[in-house]
Amino acid sequence: MTPDLPAILTCLRAELPAATLAHLRNPGPSGQDSLLVAPEHLVAVCQFLHDTAELDFDLLSNVTGVDWPEPAKADAVAVPAEGTAPVACGFLEVVYHLYSTTRRLGPLVLRARTVDRVEQVHIPSVVAVYRSAEYQEREIFDLYGVKFAGHPDLRRILMWDEFLDHPMRKDYVAPDDYQYEPTPHDAVLEKTQQYYTAKS
C-alpha cells in the first residue's frame, strides 16, 4: 500500500521541527511522490521513520544515485510542492526506498542532494539505522562519487582502487584504450582483514 506522504510529512515536522523537508510531486505516469530531506537531517529522519511504532519503516530495500548536471532537468522531473531554491551548477542525488513490512506500506521514497558535483559531495551514511545501506552506499560512492560521512568501510566496490573517475556520471567519457589494472588479490585481502580487525 502506498504511504500517506502528507501525513508522514506532518509527523516529521511535529517531531523534527528544525528539519528541512519538501514534498516533491512526480508528474510522471507512476505518480510516485517523494520527500526531499536536507542531508544534515537525513539520519534523524530515517531514525524517526524506523523507530516510531505508528510508521515502522523497518526495511531499506534500495539506495541509488542520480547525477543531475543540469538542475533545471531535476526540477522538471520532480516538481516541488513547496517553493525551494534551485541548486546551482548541478548536484548528485541519493534516493532511498523504505518499506514497513509490519504495516505493508511502501515504498516511501526519500531524496537527499549534495551541494554540487565537485567539492561538496557529502551525504551522511544511514548504515547506523539501516544496515542494508552498507554495500549500496559503497556502490554509489564508487560509481557517482558521493562521499558518505560516517560509513564504516567507504571504499570502491566495483572499480579497482586506482580508478580515477566515477563511471555513472553523465559527463563520464569511457576511454577506448586503457589498461585494466585490478588491485592485486593479496592487497584486497589485506585491506579486508584490516577492516574486520578494527571492528572486532
Language model features with spans:
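Terminal low-complexity/charged segments
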Residues: M1-S200
